[in-house]
């Protein structure tokens, strides 16, 4: 491992590959034409100033989730660390699924995580935001080249016949009756596909490789299909579209990507990736050396699902309030819950990159968040289950029931403030005759070891006075409605007499004089099962009925004045964030629980 700034960079197999390529000059002779292009375009360019090029290539057909966040941190982070650039590419080759709403949300998520797709080499600013659909002309040209070179053919079998003739792991495939067509026939038929003369599904263009290959992905995979659908970028210009496995390597090569990093499910596709780029380099359409694909294990996080289909089901069936529900593992959901970009980056670094699937405990993510917020989140007191505490001798000690005093406490503990850093101003809040305390901080008959309020016991109101409990009032059902105590004069925190009376405990409280009512949303895990959809289980059966509890709390004024998205540590309760959608709307004070002070996940 090496230390870079404050971040610990742990070596992994991808870093080792990149370092070896840099040491041996694998890509040192590359040219860069100033944007994506074919061999001739890059030949006319300059030596590539980027030592490596990676890419983050989502399909714009849904909201990004925590697994994508790992990939974003990996690809942008490697480019940053090795003097390269990471391309932001939308893999929008499927005309039926893409929506601009998703494009915008993805760009916003990447920037929120702390990354951008700009480069500035030698004073030349470039944006590397690309759309795969802008490469359709080249992809079509590449397909025609493969046909004329005898590497592709138009197949008019039914989908069912193609499936049967493909064979399986124990049985080789059977050649299509159309496989022996001449390149001239295939080219004419392919152009009829392009010109809309064939119905959807009537034919596909297939690569001509090996129907007996032990790798089923090399048994003449389909590379173009007929699909009449309006594309968000190209409109109705095309009625044929490339398959993802054909488009993806070409996109990488046009953009001069050096290290194409994918998840493990694409490992079996790598031989086709390499085969296709070798053919197109042979034909002079693309520049050698071509990109190489490397696979890593995707993120499996306990108590979380990341299937877009299943997440959409949660939204559509109103199991959650939307894609940004704070219980969702989407980046918009994590952001609204109160997770920080720094915590997610730390998490991605900490879990590392491996080639073997494993499960990461959710507590690891929460631990990274606590680590980030510990020194940043201002403290404040909030009472989540309030009961009134009446200081019965207040007027006797201070002259009137309406008298109040200011109390102060640090916004951040002194231990969290770095040397030379100016501490933030203290919080100021009022104490008076009536204050709010947690209901659990009073017991009429205390259990053994209980140190908080019970008749005759002495405790400190944190930042305020020492008090002695005298009793309580109850309603007809026997529920405590008020706790009664006497204030002990001369014991206020921060005054010379503060330690004159020893208190068994200090409890949090909020004054009735300036406390503000707040809606506090206590979020917990969305599922009760650590692997809710593993082994064919119905994930809906594992929904946690207690994943959201809403309480009316009382908070000190510094918390009520929070801006949306501002994070705090509610003393003793955990970390909370002012809700970015609802806080402040119509004067409402709304907080979400991000996580507790300790791990609650085991």
Pin down the residues of each PLM region.
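N-terminal Rossmann-like or analogous alpha/beta NTP/dinucleotide-binding catalytic cores
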Residues: 2-175, 238, 265-293, 298-303, ...
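Glycine- and acidic
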Residues: 53-62, 85-93, 253-261, 325-331, ...
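Active-site cores that bind ATP or allylic diphosphates and position pyrophosphate for catalysis
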Residues: 94, 100, 131, 145-311, ...
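Short, well-ordered beta-strand elements within core beta-sheets of diverse protein domains
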Residues: 134, 260-262, 332-336
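Long, charged, mostly alpha-helical binding arms that flank functional sites
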Residues: 288-368, 372
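Substrate/cofactor-recognition hotspot
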Residues: 348-602
């Amino acid at each position: 491992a090496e230390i870079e700034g404050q971040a610990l960079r742990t070596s992994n197999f991808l870093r080792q590959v990149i370092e070896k390529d840099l040491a041996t000059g694998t890509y040192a002779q590359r040219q860069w034409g100033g944007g994506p292009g074919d061999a001739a375009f890059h030949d006319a360019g300059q030596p590539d100033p980027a030592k490596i090029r990676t890419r983050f290539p989502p399909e714009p057909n849904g909201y990004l989730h925590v697994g994508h966040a790992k990939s974003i941190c990996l690809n942008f982070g490697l480019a940053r660390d090795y003097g390269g650039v990471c391309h932001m590419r939308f893999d929008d080759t499927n005309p039926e699924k893409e929506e601009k709403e998703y494009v915008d949300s993805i760009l916003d998520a990447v920037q929120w995580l702390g990354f951008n797709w700009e480069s500035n080499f030698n004073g030349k600013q470039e944006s590397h935001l690309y759309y795969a659909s802008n490469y359709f002309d080249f992809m079509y040209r590449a397909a025609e080249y493969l046909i004329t070179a005898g590497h592709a053919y138009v197949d008019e079998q039914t989908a069912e016949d193609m499936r049967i003739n493909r064979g399986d792991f124990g049985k080789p495939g059977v050649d299509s009756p159309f496989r022996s067509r001449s390149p001239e026939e295939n080219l004419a038929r392919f152009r009829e596909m392009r010109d809309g003369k064939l119905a959807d599904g009537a034919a596909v263009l297939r690569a001509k490789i090996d129907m007996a290959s032990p790798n089923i992905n090399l048994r003449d995979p389909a590379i173009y299909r007929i699909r009449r659908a309006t594309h968000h970028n190209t409109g109705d210009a095309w009625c044929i579209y490339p398959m993802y496995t054909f488009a993806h390597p070409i996109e990488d090569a046009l953009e001069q990507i050096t290290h194409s990093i994918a998840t493990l499910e694409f490992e079996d596709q790598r031989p086709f990736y390499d085969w296709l780029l070798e053919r197109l380099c042979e034909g002079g359409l693309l520049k050698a050396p071509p990109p190489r694909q490397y696979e890593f294990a995707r993120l499996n996080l306990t108590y979380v699902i990341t299937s877009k289909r299943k997440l959409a089901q949660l939204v559509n069936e109103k199991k959650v309030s939307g894609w940004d529900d704070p219980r969702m593992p989407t980046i918009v959901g994590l952001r609204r819950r109160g997770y920080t970009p720094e915590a997610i980056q730390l998490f991605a670094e900490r879990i590392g990159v491996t080639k073997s699937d494993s499960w990461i405990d959710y507590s690891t993510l929460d631990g990274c968040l606590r680590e980030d917020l510990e020194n940043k989140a201002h403290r404040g007191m909030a009472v989540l289950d309030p009961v009134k505490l009446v200081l019965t001798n207040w007027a006797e000690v201070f002259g009137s029931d309406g008298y109040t005093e200011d109390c102060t406490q640090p916004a951040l503990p002194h231990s969290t403030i770095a040397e030379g850093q100016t501490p933030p101003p203290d919080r100021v809040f009022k104490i008076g005759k009536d204050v709010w305390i947690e209901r659990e901080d009073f017991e009429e008959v205390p259990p053994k070891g209980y140190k908080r309020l019970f008749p005759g016991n002495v405790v400190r109101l944190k930042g305020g006075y020492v008090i002695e409990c005298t009793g309580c009032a109850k309603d007809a059902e026997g529920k405590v409605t008020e706790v009664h105590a006497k204030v002990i004069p001369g014991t206020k925190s921060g005054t010379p007499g503060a330690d004159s009376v020893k208190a068994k405990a200090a409890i949090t409280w909020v004054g009735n004089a300036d406390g503000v009512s707040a809606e506090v949303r206590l979020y917990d895990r969305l599922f009760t099962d650590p692997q809710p959809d593993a082994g064919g289980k119905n994930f809906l059966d594992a929904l946690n009925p207690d994943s959201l509890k809403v309480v009316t709390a009382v908070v000190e004024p510094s918390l009520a004045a929070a801006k949306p998205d501002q994070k705090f540590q509610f003393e003793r309760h955990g970390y909370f964030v002012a809700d970015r959608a609802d806080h402040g709307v119509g004067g409402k004070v709304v907080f979400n629980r991000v996580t507790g002070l300790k791990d609650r996940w085991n």
